[in-house]
A protein has these predicted regions:
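Short polar catalytic/cofactor-binding loops
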Residues: 7-13
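Active-site catalytic loop in hydrolytic enzyme cores
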Residues: 90-163, 176-184, 188, 247, ...
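Short, acidic/polar
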Residues: 17-26, 153-158
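C-terminal beta-strand edge segments of enzyme domains
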Residues: 135, 202-273
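Extreme N-terminal starter segment of soluble prokaryotic enzymes
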Residues: 1-5
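CN hydrolase (nitrilase-like) catalytic-core segments centered on the catalytic cysteine
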Residues: 63-83, 152-235
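Cys-nucleophile CN-hydrolase/nitrilase-fold catalytic domain and related Cys-dependent amidase chemistry
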Residues: 15, 23-105, 175-195
């Protein structure tokens, strides 16, 4: 399976310009016969909720919105699965989620969304935390999604793996001050679950926030297969070998050697793993 990691900078609050960039990169990816392309956290609007402020609601979208319509059309015309971060409008007035949507060919709207579960810093003031851990069946594989700070919580990645994901995508807006933590977390989640992890970090600045890039595909042994540059935009293409992933799970049996007779992870839908 061939994937593309779209490491981009965004214009804060300018959805039109950001969507135009996303559209252009989707077209480039399709020309390279990519199966899945992933964009960073909040790619359509920029990241900083405190800078967007009360405009968050106006920038938010739900089923059938501008982002959903455009990416559905692109997915269908390009035969491309698209994962993209955006501000999702909730059912209650003023409720917004830091979400990543997924679009697959032959559907008129997004397949679904993952709403960021672990909010950090000022995100907690503006966004509502997610409550669900969905998986998404695409034409090529079963996809799990986490967003940025979610990668620091082993339980989430473990549940995604145990539910049957083939790969985890991690749209992010990670700051350069914590670059070392990013590297360790991404490799650890991949290795301990025997799963490929595609981490897509944005670049650029928003006032005092500096996003460092460094998007990467990590294999099931926790090794980096492809690494984007630091600090500038880049579209990188990667091959994912699920046969190698299966081989790794046989050689490094962390999932099979869990002692569920003495411990478990309980997900609030009452399924235990």
């Amino acid at each position: 399976m061939k994937i593309a990691l779209a490491q981009i900078d965004t214009v804060l609050g300018n959805k039109r310009k950001n969507l135009l960039k996303i559209e252009n990169l989707c077209s480039k990816a399709a020309k390279e016969n990519v199966d899945i392309i992933c964009f960073p956290e909040l790619s359509t609007t920029g990241y900083s909720p405190e800078l967007l402020g009360s405009n968050l609601w106006n920038l938010s979208e739900s089923f059938g919105g501008k982002t959903d319509t455009l990416l559905s059309e692109l997915s269908n015309s390009l035969k491309l699965t698209i994962i993209c971060g955006f501000i999702e409008r909730g059912k209650i007035s003023g409720e917004v989620f830091n979400s990543a949507g997924i679009w697959i060919p032959h559907k008129k709207h997004f397949l679904g969304t993952f709403q960021k579960i672990h909010l950090i810093n000022n995100e907690r003031i503006w966004f509502t935390q997610g409550m669900h851990i969905p998986l998404f069946d695409t034409p090529k594989c079963r996809v799990g999604i986490m967003i940025c700070h979610d990668v620091g919580f082993p339980e989430l990645a473990r549940i995604i793996a145990l539910k049957g994901a083939d790969i985890i995508f991690l749209p992010s807006a990670w700051h350069k001050e914590a670059k070392d933590i990013w590297t360790i977390n991404c490799a650890s989640r991949a290795l301990e679950n025997g799963i490929h992890l595609a981490a897509v970090n944005r670049c650029g600045k928003e006032e005092n926030l500096h996003f460092f890039g460094g998007s990467q595909l990590i294999d099931a042994r926790g090794q980096t297969l492809k690494l984007a540059n630091y600090n500038s935009e880049e579209l990188i293409f990667c091959e994912v070998d699920f046969n190698e992933q299966l081989k790794t799970r046989l050689e490094i049996p962390y999932l099979r050697h869990r002692r569920t007779d003495i411990y478990s992870i309980e997900y609030t839908d009452k399924n235990e793993y």
